[in-house]
Amino acid sequence: MKEISTSSGLGGILNAFRNITKESKRITFVGTPGFCAPFAELIAYPIRDAGKELAFVANLDFDDAKRIVYTSHGMQMAENTDAAADTVAILGGLAMPKISVDVHALKSMIDRILGGDGMLIGVCFMSIFELAGWYDILDFDYMIDTNTSVKILEK
């Protein structure tokens, strides 16, 4: 994949996702329930008023997809919905060694969600998809790859 832009901070992630998905009508996020679900809700926030249908699939549980809706408390998971979409956003927690999602089973589910045609976006930290070898298996259209630095201060 070739680099097309750089940015920093949380705004860099959110703005990139909003720009990449301008033409998307229905977006399904796929990630782990604990680690990735809050990121899906966060990434969905900037497109809350864009008229897009949003869903979240935990791990490989296609049949238990949840709608993501805007509420007075921000973006939240809601009732079950159809996972079919024109855009899939895969979240990096799936590639973490402790999670060990079978990438080939994930690829099959992505094909099922997209119905054979659509856009695949990866959103990850510290190049986890590349390090896990997923670039060779999943045909990402875009990758939002960010690094974090942590500073802890004490009085």
Regions found by a protein language model. Name each.
Residues 1-24:
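Short N-terminal or domain-adjacent regulatory/targeting segments
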Residues 26, 53, 119:
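Residues at the starts of beta-strands that form the adenosine-phosphate
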Residues 39-98:
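Long, charge-dense
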